Design a protein with these regions (language model features):
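Intrinsically disordered, low-complexity terminal regions
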Residues: 1-364
């Protein structure tokens, strides 16, 4: 039998099936064939799960004396943590679910709950989701202020008044306030704001970050974003790649290393060093603190206020020095342009600037 005959037979089978669908009597409890039925079935498939329901699970969780940390896992949307003078944990987990109808959607939301796991000194609260449909969860939780809190994989985290905070794998904005100890973790793509914290150690990428009144120093790895540190204390150490770093009124030593972008130090209160490549650097001096500035290919600018006493040692290789604002003329020998000068009275702090293929600007 050839291909032509097989195609003819297949055609008869298809036509016969269609004729049967049009002419066969309906089964008991069903309707006969119609194009309306086909359309309704297709529309039902395209609509997916039109049902919607919201459920809030509220509970109080007792703590044992040995618990030191709360870990919150698999909350799909925002997490809000509030530290209080209390001995237990109180939470409200809000679940939004879809389903084929509202009643079924509510049943799915009812099945979306926290599972508790005690791991050494950590209490773990992990959201368990049903296999059916799709659920979104948000959490508001009140905890004892003595607890460290770790949040993973949420979309937006707000935390206040706890012993320490760790953020891992989250998205959305992060706002942390009044954290007695360390703020640690990794974050990317959305803003981070930390106010009143013991210390900070974070890796940040493609975002804006703001840190204010951190008492015990900051260690940051910043990539492709903006980072501002205000009125903090302790040592600051920043690794920067293609970022804009601003440190203002830091009461502790500061080191910024890396390449590309921009670094601004305003009124440093202790010894500071900027070691960059291909980055613009600006330092404003209001007191007697030693500063070292190293960069290439971009402008290095130092602004020396009247309140500062400074022994300046500046040299640009294959570049220039602009000092007209302070009525000074640099000296050029070969490819090196130098400016050495004492600003203020008495013995000042040593300020060293080295730039390659870039300009040095000295201003008041």
């Amino acid at each position: 039998m050839g291909k032509r005959e097989l195609l003819i037979i297949a055609g008869f089978v298809v036509v016969g099936a269609l004729v049967y669908q049009f002419t066969a009597p309906p089964s008991t409890g069903t309707s006969s064939f119609s194009f309306a039925n086909i359309f309704n079935e297709a529309r039902r498939e395209m609509r997916g799960n039109p049902g919607r329901a919201n459920v809030t699970h509220s509970a109080t969780v007792p703590l044992e004396a040995g618990h030191r940390e709360l870990r919150i896992l698999r909350v799909s949307q925002s997490v809000t943590v509030v530290g209080e003078d209390r001995s237990d944990i109180e939470y409200a987990l809000t679940v939004s679910s879809n389903g084929p109808d509202d009643e079924t959607a509510k049943a799915y939301a009812d099945k979306t709950v926290f599972e508790r796991d005690d791991v050494a000194e950590s209490l773990v609260l992990r959201v368990s989701y049903p296999d059916e449909a799709s659920q979104q969860t948000t959490l508001v939780v009140k905890v004892p202020a003595r607890l460290a809190v770790r949040v993973e994989n949420a979309v937006g985290v707000t935390m206040t008044g706890v012993a320490s905070a760790h953020i891992e794998g989250a998205r959305g904005e992060i706002t942390l306030t009044d954290i007695a100890g360390a703020v640690t973790g990794v974050h990317q793509d959305d803003d981070v704001r930390v106010t009143n914290a013991g210390s900070v150690k974070l890796r940040l990428s493609r975002l804006r970050s703001n840190f204010e009144n951190v008492s015990g120093g900051l260690t940051l790895d910043v990539r492709d974003g903006e980072c501002t540190i205000l009125k903090s204390a302790g040592a600051v150490e920043v690794e920067s790649q293609r970022a804009e770093i601003t440190v203002t009124s830091q009461r502790g030593p500061t080191i910024v290393r890396g390449s590309d972008g921009r670094v601004t130090l305003d009124s440093p209160g202790a010894e500071s060093k900027v070691d960059m490549r291909r980055a613009e650097v600006e330092v404003t001096l209001t007191g007697n603190v030693p500063v070292t500035i190293l960069t290439t290919d971009q402008t290095a600018r130092v602004i020396i206020k009247e309140s500062a006493s400074v022994e300046l040692d500046a040299m640009s290789t294959s570049g220039t020095i602009q000092a007209a604002d302070v009525n000074l003329t640099p000296e050029t020998v070969g490819e090196n342009t130098k400016l050495v000068h004492t600003f203020g009275t008495g013995r000042g702090a040593r300020v060293t600037i080295r730039n390659t293929r870039g300009e040095i600007v000295v201003r008041r």
